[in-house]
A protein has these predicted regions:
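Preference for long, amphipathic alpha-helical scaffolds in soluble/luminal domains
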Residues: 1-313
Length: 313
C-alpha cells in the first residue's frame, strides 16, 4: 500500500489529483489501485470502463489458443521467427500491463505460460541480455518472480555477470572504440538491475549490489554500445510497448531500478537523479515523456514518478 498520498511538500504541484481526474481510464485505474485500494466503488466503476477498452478487446480477440499472437510478417528461418514471436509476446504483455491487467484472467495466464516456454532448458530467453532482463522484470510485475522456471532465467544471468558488475551481450555492437578495455553495457545493466531489484530475495544479493554500484557510478555516462548510445538517452523518461520503448526510461528507469534497494537511497548519484527528476515537473503538474522537449506531459510517466517517490519515502 502507498505510504504517501500527498506530494505537495516534495513537488511544486501535487499531480495525484490530476491523474485521478484527467488520466485515461487504464492509467486512472492503476493510480487508484495503487494509492487508494480501499475505494472499491470507484475502482469497480473504472474496472467496467477499462474492460471495454478497444485496444484491450482487440488484443484478447487476436490472441491464439496457445497464448501467443500472430506475427505481422512471415519468417522462413525458425530462429528468426521464434525471436520475433518472443518479442511480440513481450510487447503485448507490456501493453496489457499498462492497460491494467494482472495474472488473474485465463487469457493472461496463457500468455505468460507461452512467454515462459520461450526459455531454453538452461534458462535463456531468445535475443540479447537486455531482452532476458526485461522478460524477467515483466514476469515479476505479473507476480511470477518466484516461479522455479523463471528462477532459471535469473540464474542464467547471474552466471554471465561480468567482473565490473554489469552485463553485455556477446553480439552487441560497439558505438565507439573500446580497445582500452571493454566494460559492460550501461542500459543492458540498468534493465537487468531492475529485474533483480524486483525480486524479493535477489535484490539483497551480492550480484544485485555489484550491478547497482556499476550503474550508480555511471549515471549520465554515454553508453558505448548500440543500445541507446545518444547522449540524451537519459532524458527519455517514457516507456511503452514498442520494440525500443520497452527499454527506454532514462533517468526515471535508473531510479526505478535502484529504488527497491534501500542500501542505495543515500547514494549521491541516486539522490542527484531524484532531485533532477523533481525539477522536470511541468507547469501543468505532469512530468514529460522526454525532458526538455515535451510541454504537455505524460500521464504514465507522472504515475511512475509518484510511485518512485512513494517508494523512497
Amino acid at each position: 500500500m502507498a505510504q504517501t498520498k500527498d506530494f505537495s511538500s516534495i513537488l511544486k504541484t501535487d499531480p495525484l489529483p490530476i491523474l485521478i481526474e484527467k488520466a485515461p481510464v487504464p492509467t486512472r485505474f492503476r493510480v487508484l489501485k495503487y494509492f487508494y485500494p480501499e475505494d472499491k466503488k470507484t475502482l469497480g466503476e473504472l474496472q467496467k470502463q477499462r474492460k471495454n477498452n478497444k485496444r484491450r478487446t482487440q488484443l484478447f480477440k487476436s490472441q491464439r489458443n496457445d497464448g501467443s499472437w500472430e506475427l505481422d510478417d512471415d519468417y522462413t528461418i525458425d530462429k528468426k521467427r521464434i525471436a520475433m514471436s518472443f518479442l511480440k509476446q513481450l510487447q503485448n504483455l507490456t501493453e496489457l500491463l499498462y492497460l491494467g491487467e494482472t495474472a488473474k484472467p485465463e487469457t493472461i495466464k496463457q500468455a505468460l505460460i507461452r512467454l515462459i516456454k520461450y526459455q531454453k532448458e538452461d534458462g535463456k530467453f531468445p535475443l540479447n541480455h537486455h531482452h532476458q532482463g526485461y522478460a524477467l522484470w515483466l514476469l515479476a510485475q505479473y507476480g511470477l518472480a518466484g516461479n522455479p522456471i523463471v528462477e532459471k532465467g535469473y540464474r542464467w544471468l547471474i552466471k554471465r555477470q561480468k567482473k565490473d558488475g554489469g552485463w553485455i551481450s556477446p553480439v552487441m555492437k560497439m558505438s565507439e572504440d573500446m580497445s582500452d578495455g571493454l566494460t559492460s553495457c550501461l542500459w543492458t545493466t540498468i534493465i537487468i538491475t531492475q529485474a533483480f531489484s524486483a525480486h524479493s530475495r535477489l535484490k539483497n544479493s551480492e550480484n544485485t549490489r555489484k550491478a547497482a554500484q556499476f550503474i550508480s557510478d555511471r549515471y549520465l555516462y554515454k553508453n558505448h554500445t548500440s543500445l541507446f548510445p545518444e547522449p540524451d538517452a537519459w532524458d527519455y523518461l517514457y516507456t511503452d510497448h514498442t520494440v525500443n520503448g520497452m527499454f527506454r526510461g532514462g533517468t526515471l528507469r535508473f531510479c526505478e531500478a535502484l529504488a527497491p534497494l534501500n542500501y542505495m537511497h543515500e547514494n549521491k548519484n541516486f539522490k542527484k537523479a531524484i532531485d533532477w527528476l523533481k525539477e522536470q515537473q511541468l507547469d501543468n503538474g505532469l512530468f514529460p515523456a522526454k525532458a526538455g522537449s515535451d510541454s504537455k506531459g505524460d500521464y504514465q510517466v507522472t504515475f511512475r514518478v509518484l510511485k518512485l517517490l512513494d517508494q523512497i519515502q
